[in-house]
A protein has these predicted regions:
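Alpha-helical substrate-binding/gating segment
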Residues: 57-71, 82-100
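Glycine-rich "substrate-gating" loop/helix at the edge of Rossmann-like oxidoreductase active sites
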Residues: 27-54, 74-86
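Active-site Tyr-X1-5-Lys
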Residues: 1-27, 32, 56-66
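Intrinsically disordered, low-complexity segments enriched in polar/charged residues with Gly/Pro
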Residues: 16, 48-50, 69
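A local structural micro-motif
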Residues: 22, 71-72
């Protein structure tokens, strides 16, 4: 619902105020390193893990790393788009370099 409302508000501001808007829907971002963070280990992004509510990919990675069976909640029929952090950063960079 909120993404739909966002789109309607963006359309409104574009038509009424001539605001140029780029809205990026990238899915779930995974990974911890980018070219910038590779320059210094103190810049590495956090790897958040939450057994119940965290990103399924992070949960699966943690469970696999410790030899724990992968836990699937619900029916297992959920689908989500995943994008690596390097690709996400590149997407934002391209959007900034090519405004509407």
């Amino acid at each position: 619902m909120t993404k739909t409302l966002d789109q309607l508000l963006f359309l409104y501001y574009n038509k009424n105020d001539k605001v140029r808007i780029t809205d990026l829907h990238q899915g779930i971002v995974w990974g911890t390193n980018t070219d910038a963070t590779d320059r210094d280990p103190r810049l590495t992004n956090r790897f958040d893990y939450d057994g119940d509510y965290g990103t399924v990919l992070n949960r699966f990675l943690m469970q696999a790393a410790i030899g724990y069976p992968l836990t699937v909640h619900g029916t297992g029929g959920q689908t989500r788009a995943f994008i690596h952090i390097r690709d996400s950063v590149r997407c934002v960079q391209l959007a900034l370099e090519n405004p509407p």
